[in-house]
Amino acid sequence: MKIKKVYADALTTLAKGTDAGIYRLNPKRVEIVSCEQDVKRVLAECEKTGKSVTFKAGGTSLSGQTITDSVLMEISPDYGKVKISGDGSLAKFPCGITGEEANRWLRPYGRKLGPSPASIKSARIGGIVANNSSGSSYGIIHNSYNTIRDMEIIFADGAFLDTSSLASRRDFMQTHIGLLEKLMNFRLEILLNPDMEDRILSKYELKNTCGYGMNSFLDYTDPYDILMHLMVGSEGTLGFISSVTFETVPDESLKASALIYFPSLIEACRAIDPLRQCKVSAAELMDRNALHAVEDEPG
């Protein structure tokens, strides 16, 4: 039986048009895409009719990134295929797979994804990268931005780019040389403006998932690398992330956690530098109010 891919009835659009946030818009139509051709078809139809399109992966966003009153493109779980290198250090995942499922694929290799958002059981690769998710454990070190190796992207005009393929890069340069030149001009403009350069460098020393990754103009000299890293955190506004190849991180077999009490918040903050030297992957500060909220809970 052929699976229905288009919904326009009020009940289904209401159900599928929600995410984990507090905001509400009802899409006019929901398109379920399971391959690149589906994506290109929907983008072409929206271009022809002048309708906007919003991408939805797991729908775990809290800020309304996946709601729309126009066309909603929902990624099917069977979109694309998984490919893992011999030692598991590189892994290509399609946009429709959840972070938890990706880690299940990597577990036999003793590896895992760098980004580990709290919603990893439901959040899918496309959304994790498009929102530059990292979770509490890895901050700015092993987030999506710093662990991607390659990406397959579909743009609004239907153009396809596989950054791992020299042939795809050549084809894209022939059709989109203007875009690549603009990226390099933006980079030159930043380099010629010391104040702008310093501001970008200081901004991205801290954990920052908001807005476009302007640091890509300073971190990379190749326009394809700049473009790929601009996709991270772009929330679907620059193109459709079809698949991502990650540089995976070790999944340590031995793990431990500790609850440490300090006489004051000041003393707790003084422990940050020593904890960094111990390579602690995550630390959470809880004040008396936080402890009071759970002190009567069993366990």
What are these regions (language model features)?
Residues L11-I22, N26, S119-I120, R199-G213, ...:
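Active-site-adjacent loop/helix segments that line or gate small-molecule/cofactor pockets in enzymes
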Residues A130, Y138-I141, I148-G299:
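C-terminal substrate-binding/cap subdomain adjacent to the FAD-binding core in PCMH-type
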Residues L62-I67:
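Short glycine-biased active-site loop of nucleotidyltransferases that positions the nucleotide triphosphate
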Residues A20-V53, V71, I75-P117, V129, ...:
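N-terminal glycine-rich flavin-associated loop
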Residues M1-R29, E45-V53, G58, C278-P298:
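N-terminal accessory segments
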Residues A57-T60, A118, L166, R288:
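Short, ordered loop/turn segments at secondary-structure junctions
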Residues T13, E36-V39, K121, E267, ...:
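Short acidic loop-to-helix transition motifs that present clustered carboxylates
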Residues T60, S119-V129, S234:
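Conserved A3 ("GATE") glycine/threonine-rich loop of ANL adenylate-forming enzymes
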